Amino acid sequence: MPKASHQDLRFAFRELLASGSCFHTASVFDPMSARIAADLGFEVGILGGSVASLQVLAAPDFALITLSEFVEQATRIGRVAQLPVLADADHGYGNALNVMRTVIELERAGVAALTIEDTLLPAQFGRKSTDLIPVEEGVGKIRAALEARVDSSLSIIARTNAGVLSTEEIIVRTQSYQKAGADAICMVGVKDFEQLEQIAEHLTVPLMLVTYGNPNLRDDERLARLGVRIVVDGHAAYFAAIKATYDCLRLQRGQQNKSENLSATELSHTYTQPEDYIRWAKEYMSVEE
């Protein structure tokens, strides 16, 4: 079977957005996982920013990974991927001009789509880690991203955190990003269908949700009727890989009979050492939780 080009995969992603169905992403974090996901029939994969930070730096999701490091990983995946890959480009690695550079590099890497979020990243001195940038700045980033892409089939998705805003504020932000030309709107932190319905009735572009398995949003048909086309449940495949590596190496060392049996989440927490970063952020930056 002939190999799909990067543009073929971008068109395939746009077909997902234009469909009447809801699709769940596969967590793809290296070339092998991308091939496995495609072979198993997943329609779309996602390279998460948090997963890239774990894979490249063994560091928590504190905006520590650089653009070049993220692009390198996306490029490795793009060489072999035969499913559309959506890149979680965090905040675009800086201001609107940095966003333009991010789009240029990720387009060359072969991703089918990318998200740009309006979280204030990296964390700023004396600010909360969940603070958002002004909506006007977010609009500027989306407009800059659209200007920077060469291949118009590359989807630019605006992302915001519904978990730290009122429903009215979410509507204002998402409508602003829609008006700026975003191909879709991504939201994290939507609580339930009632809130989603209130937001969705004000939007016409396709929606993407990061739910992390929220049980209040587990109804694909209902999600699809509200315009949701892409759902990110989390990155279970990556954490399963961490767990499998730990268990295999533990067995090789003859430690399989020990009572310790850490979960994937506990292992990730142990080996990324987030307490150190939290302490440093408080000590050197007065960053609030």
Curated annotation (Swiss-Prot):
MF terms from GO for this chain are:
magnesium ion binding; methylisocitrate lyase activity; oxaloacetate decarboxylase activity
Primary enzyme class: lyase
* Catalysed reaction equations from the record: oxaloacetate + H(+) = pyruvate + CO2
GO BP field: oxaloacetate metabolic process; propionate catabolic process, 2-methylcitrate cycle; pyruvate biosynthetic process
Q: Where along the chain is Mg(2+) bound?
A: 88
Q: Where does substrate bind?
A: 50, 159, 235
Q: Which Pfam families match?
A: PEP_mutase
EC id:
4.1.1.112
Instruction: Identify the SUPFAM superfamilies for this entry.
Output: Phosphoenolpyruvate/pyruvate domain
- What detail does the entry give on cofactor binding? Binds 1 Mg(2+) ion per subunit.
Which prosthetic group or cofactor does it need? Mg(2+)
| InterPro entries xrefs | ICL/PEPM, Oxaloacetate_deCOase_bac, Pyrv/PenolPyrv_kinase-like_dom, Pyrv_kinase-like_dom_sf
Q: What's the domain of life for this entry?
A: Bacteria
- Keyword field: Decarboxylase, Lyase, Magnesium, Metal-binding
What is the protein's quaternary organization? Homotetramer; dimer of dimers.
Provide the family line.
Belongs to the isocitrate lyase/PEP mutase superfamily. Oxaloacetate decarboxylase family.
Q: What does this protein do?
A: Catalyzes the decarboxylation of oxaloacetate into pyruvate. Seems to play a role in maintaining cellular concentrations of bicarbonate and pyruvate.
> What is this protein's name?
Oxaloacetate decarboxylase
